[in-house]
Amino acid sequence: PGSTIKPIVALSALENKIINTKFKVHCKGHKNPLELYGQTYHCWKKEGHGLLNLREAMKQSCDTYFYEVARRLGVDKLSETAKKFGLGEKVFNNLFDNEKSGLVPSTFWKKNALGKNWLLGETIITGIGQGYIQTTPIQLCLMTAQIANGGYKIYPKIIIDDSINEDDKFQSLVNQTNNIKIIQDAMFSSTNELRGT
């Protein structure tokens, strides 16, 4: 999914009290990349973004910021939040035979599926939507809609008739409503402000 995963990474870090809105990371682009076990991780912006808080990092889609957030958060907490928002599972619950569930990786998943331990570098790249993580377009729509609606679970359906489904209840997906507002504002800034990506 690439950078479309960044709102969930940020929300998960806020919900787990790993960061707050004042948490800053200095992005130096290609000048001083993060080096870990022989791998180099740098931002997409060659000259870097400078010192960024959450809102600015989301607006400018700074990879360096999200590497650090993912590193602090850990893949298991990120996985838990992503699954709450519908990633890693079929959206229409067997309505379509060819719908894919995608993949939200975790330490348990890798050990169980591949027989290997999870690596810190894998957490870092998961923070920018790279590596094992896989999503479908409808999952990303659902994730975004649930952020936009204030963090409430949506049960999408194909409308056959207009009867009301009693299963449609307002189930909050977040611990603190302020966290979802922070993410909404950052997403808005990405598309509506100068330097937004």
Predicted regions located by residue number:
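Beta-lactam-recognizing serine transpeptidase/beta-lactamase-like catalytic domain environment
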Residues: 1-3, 8-197
